[in-house]
């Protein structure tokens, strides 16, 4: 049956019900309003029978699905759904089945999916505690993925006088009738949302939202306007909406990062109260536009009397503040990567708060359609922008050569489509930057910048600031690179020489006037033909230069190099030029009499990081691999280049820590020593800084882990491994377990143990000797928060079948970026 015919029959059915059952419709009172149920007035009451023909329901799902049908039938007016006092579950609270996403590629499983707008859900008594709309599922606890009670598509949604709670990891306490109390599904904090919305004009009024991690009180994921007034929010990390205005709201945070990152024009907190026990409270994890006016923080374990605005900021954003307190005193804000702007005495304050003390909600919510949800008197109110955005956050220019034009635009809150006029002024963030940069401003509010320091050899980083007449600010980072010169020439041509057990590339460059050697040197080993003779038609990269300014001109030989020709390439460079074309140097003969490799202290600065799939003795194998046990989890392609690893700085918990980091999810490295040797013992010393801060290691428990292979046959994927993994039991710890691999299939050879030390400062020791396999994870970095009885250090011991292979490997299946790792050190020893 076509959709039009379905709608026709449904319309006939609805009209029949309305014409023949008016006298049977249910009558009730809301405040002083006497109401009768109809196609735009629903009543949900557990004490009544579920009678769709009367628009009376005993559950949330049927009411919303009827609203969806009525709306699809063409009804234009608002649908009001009233709830009598009770606890309403979106699905069976005691059902142990695992909810799967309805769409195969969706990352979210849902309780109720609905496509309908212009709906108002209302608690009948006016007390939000009387009506509880509840869910009881979270990621890995009743749901296969991240779970949301509502997955809603629709504009103009209003929720009023209701409590919404995902009680997967918190207890439901219903004061009106304790018989309806319900114990949480798990003690573990897990990803459990209340609602995600693809829509605009979302209004939450006098509601309570309760949850753990990822609470999501009707968060709009498409940038739609979102207004919460007189609401109470109790939540964990990454919970708050990213584009919203909060008025007179109360927050209790069970995390130090309740908001992941603001989007669009950001978030605004007006006259709100915040409470947390976290020792180092952040407003958000990653920076974006945000404003806080007339707010109060109560923090029981405050460190240094500071509120930390964000862990990772954006160059051009600002924190706009006025009249905020922490524990009764004026708010002290950690500047960090953001610059706070006190707007108390600036015209910008009027964008948020009028002279009479009322809050300018219309200015914030009006958008392109002048949405005036609070019925504010708009006479005489002008548009006051709240966001100033530069056209370029980061600029690179060549000193004394390049001129770059920069502009900025001002925007109203919740409207990025229509920039508004603003008078702009450009200046230096610091007076000292004038030594390196010249700013020229035109009469259109744009500026031109040029590097001006003569004969400068070094890169200089400067910041310029743009300010609007009403007090908005933004900035650009300008990296001024020295004026380019020709690359250096050789004064001594490259020559490969063997010095004991090393090859040394000797050369000299013509470097004057403070220039330094930043040449890129790479080392290669040839292949052999089927008869074992060296040939020069294919080369394996065995070492490289990963760090600018540290040319790797020495190559340590091992017995795996015997019988091969080694070559080195050098691309000469200093800090004021691009690299020259490569010049090659070769050993005059094959390598002979190299030492047996019994110890290998791996220097991450020189480790090859590009894809190299072949398994060859003495050569690193670098691949992106999706293990079979992650098959059911969809991975997105995160990079489109040949790198598997990067030598770079970490994120979040590994900020300012340099080492080898993931370039791809599924990054794997393997090293195969001399394969003809029978190995009796092997040990691994591994130093790592995970980016996750509190010991959880990975972004989720969807097949994310790290395996360290020991005494491994890389050719057959057989041997042993220590697995570090996150599972559903903990949000602040990982588990570690031994695995035995046989042709890529594995089984556990011990019981897992939990540990919280898989965070910055982690050291892992792994050893196999005969039948004894041991591992320890230690961390001497003390943390000020409660680890809930889980130790920071742990060890494992198992008796296993011996292995005679000496291969090493590392497989990481976690996300890149903030869920990755920084490998600081790796040492391998064999007997």
Predicted stretch roles:
Residues 59, 82-111, 124, 147-149, ...:
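Low-complexity, Ser/Thr/Pro/Gly-rich disordered linker/stalk regions
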Residues 78, 295, 684-686, 756-798:
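Carbohydrate-binding surfaces in secreted/extracellular proteins
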Residues 129-131, 167, 648-737:
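Secretory/extracellular carbohydrate-interaction modules
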Residues 383-425, 430-601:
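Ser/Thr/Pro/Gly-rich low-complexity disordered regions
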């Amino acid at each position: 049956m076509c959709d039009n015919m379905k709608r026709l029959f449904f319309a006939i059915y609805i009209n029949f019900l309305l014409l023949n059952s008016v006298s049977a419709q249910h009558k009730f009172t809301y405040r002083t309003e006497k109401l009768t149920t109809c196609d735009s007035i629903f009543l949900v009451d557990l004490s009544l029978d579920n009678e769709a023909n009367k628009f009376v329901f005993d559950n949330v799902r049927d009411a919303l699905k009827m609203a969806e049908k009525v709306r699809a039938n063409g009804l234009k007016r608002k649908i009001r759904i009233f709830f009598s006092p009770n606890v309403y579950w979106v699905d069976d609270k005691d059902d142990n089945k695992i909810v799967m996403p309805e769409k195969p590629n969706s990352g979210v499983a849902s309780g109720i999916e609905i496509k309908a707008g212009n709906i108002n859900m209302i608690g009948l008594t006016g007390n939000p505690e009387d009506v509880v709309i509840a869910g009881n599922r979270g990621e890995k606890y009743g749901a296969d993925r991240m779970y949301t009670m509502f997955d809603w598509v629709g504009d103009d949604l209003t929720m009023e006088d209701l409590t919404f709670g995902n009680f997967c990891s918190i207890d439901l306490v219903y004061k009106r009738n304790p018989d309806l109390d319900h114990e949480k599904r798990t003690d573990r904090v897990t990803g459990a949302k209340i609602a995600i919305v693809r829509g605009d004009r979302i209004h939450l009024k006098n509601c309570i939202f309760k949850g753990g991690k990822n609470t999501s009180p009707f968060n709009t994921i498409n940038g739609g306007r979102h207004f919460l007034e007189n609401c109470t929010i109790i939540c964990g990390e990454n919970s708050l909406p990213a584009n919203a205005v909060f008025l007179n709201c109360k927050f209790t945070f069970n995390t130090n990062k309740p908001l992941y990152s603001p989007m669009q024009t950001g978030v605004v907190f007006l006259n709100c109260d915040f409470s947390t026990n976290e020792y180092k409270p952040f407003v958000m994890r990653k920076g974006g536009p945000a404003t806080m006016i007339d707010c109060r923080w109560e923090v029981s374990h405050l460190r240094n009397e500071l509120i930390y605005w964000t862990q990772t900021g954006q160059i051009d954003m600002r924190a706009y503040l006025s009249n905020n307190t922490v524990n009764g005193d004026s708010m002290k804000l950690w500047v960090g990567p953001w610059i706070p702007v006190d707007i108390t005495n600036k015209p910008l304050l009027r964008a948020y708060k009028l002279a009479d003390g009322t809050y300018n909600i219309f200015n914030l919510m009006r958008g392109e359609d002048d949405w005036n949800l609070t019925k504010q008197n708009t006479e005489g109110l002008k548009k006051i922008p709240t966001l100033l955005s530069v056209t370029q956050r980061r600029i690179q220019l060549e000193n004394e050569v390049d001129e770059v034009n920069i502009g900025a635009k001002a925007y109203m809150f919740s409207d990025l489509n229509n920039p508004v006029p603003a008078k702009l002024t450009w200046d230096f963030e610091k007076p000292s930057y004038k030594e390196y940069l010249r700013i020229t401003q035109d009469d259109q509010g744009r500026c031109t910048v040029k590097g001006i320091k003569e004969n400068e050899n070094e890169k200089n980083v400067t910041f310029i600031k743009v300010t609007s007449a009403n007090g908005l600010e933004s900035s650009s980072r300008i990296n001024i690179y020295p004026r380019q010169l020709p690359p250096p020439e050789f004064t001594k041509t490259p020559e490969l020489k063997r010095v004991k057990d090393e090859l040394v590339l000797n050369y000299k460059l013509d470097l004057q006037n403070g220039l330094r050697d930043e040449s890129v040197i790479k080392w290669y080993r040839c292949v052999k033909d089927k008869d074992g003779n060296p040939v020069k038609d294919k080369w394996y990269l065995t070492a490289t230069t990963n760090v600018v300014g540290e040319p790797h001109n020495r190559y340590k030989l091992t017995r795996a190099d015997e019988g091969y020709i080694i070559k080195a390439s050098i691309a000469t460079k200093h800090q004021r030029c691009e690299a020259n074309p490569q010049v090659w140097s070769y050993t005059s003969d094959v390598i002979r009499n190299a030492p047996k490799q019994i110890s290998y202290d791996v220097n991450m600065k020189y480790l090859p990081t590009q894809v190299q799939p072949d398994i060859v003795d003495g050569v690193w194998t670098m691949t992106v691999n999706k293990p079979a046990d992650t098959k059911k989890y969809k991975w997105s392609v995160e990079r489109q280049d040949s790198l598997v690893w990067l030598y770079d700085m970490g994120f979040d918990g590994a900020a300012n820590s340099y080492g080898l980091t993931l370039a791809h999810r599924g990054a794997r490295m393997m090293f195969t020593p001399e394969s003809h040797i029978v190995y009796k013992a092997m040990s691994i010393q591994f130093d790592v800084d995970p980016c996750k801060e509190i010991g959880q290691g990975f972004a989720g428990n969807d097949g994310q882990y790290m395996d360290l292979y020991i005494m491994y046959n890389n050719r057959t994927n057989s041997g042993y491994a220590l697995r570090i993994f996150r599972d559903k039991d903990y949000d602040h710890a990982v588990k570690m377990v031994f695995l035995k691999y046989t042709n890529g299939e594995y089984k556990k050879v011990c019981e897992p143990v939990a540990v919280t030390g898989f965070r910055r400062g982690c050291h892992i020791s792994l050893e196999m000797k005969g039948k004894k396999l041991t591992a320890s994870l230690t961390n001497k970095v003390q943390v000020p928060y409660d680890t809930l009885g889980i130790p920071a250090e742990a060890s494992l011991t198992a008796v296993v079948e011996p292995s005679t292979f000496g291969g090493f490997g590392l497989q990481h299946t976690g996300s890149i970026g903030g869920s990755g790792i920084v490998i600081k050190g790796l040492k391998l020893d064999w007997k």
